[in-house]
């Protein structure tokens, strides 16, 4: 084969690997965030305190469950 064809094959392979790597990394990050949201009950409690609310445990857990539920439904609707 000529050198030009080899160079084109290498460029196509690199581009395919780049696109595939980005796709796989994106799926893994979405899965990780869906399973373990970055907003924890402690962070919600702190935000409520800063807004002047007295955070009851029931309200904190309700807010946290709503956030987790929303994140999971957002991922499912993307698919």
UniProtKB/Swiss-Prot annotation:
Which residues are listed as membrane-spanning? 5-25
- Compartmental location: Cell membrane
InterPro entries on file:
UPF0154 (IPR005359)
Q: GO CC annotation: what is one?
A: plasma membrane
Keywords, in A-Z order = Cell membrane, Membrane, Transmembrane, Transmembrane helix
Kindly give the membrane topology term recorded for this protein: Single-pass membrane protein
Q: Which Pfam family name is an example for this entry? A: UPF0154
Indicate the principal place this protein occupies in or around the cell: membrane
Q: Which family does it belong to?
A: Belongs to the UPF0154 family.
Q: What is this protein called?
A: UPF0154 protein SAK_1616
Q: What is the native source organism of this protein?
A: Streptococcus agalactiae serotype Ia (strain ATCC 27591 / A909 / CDC SS700)
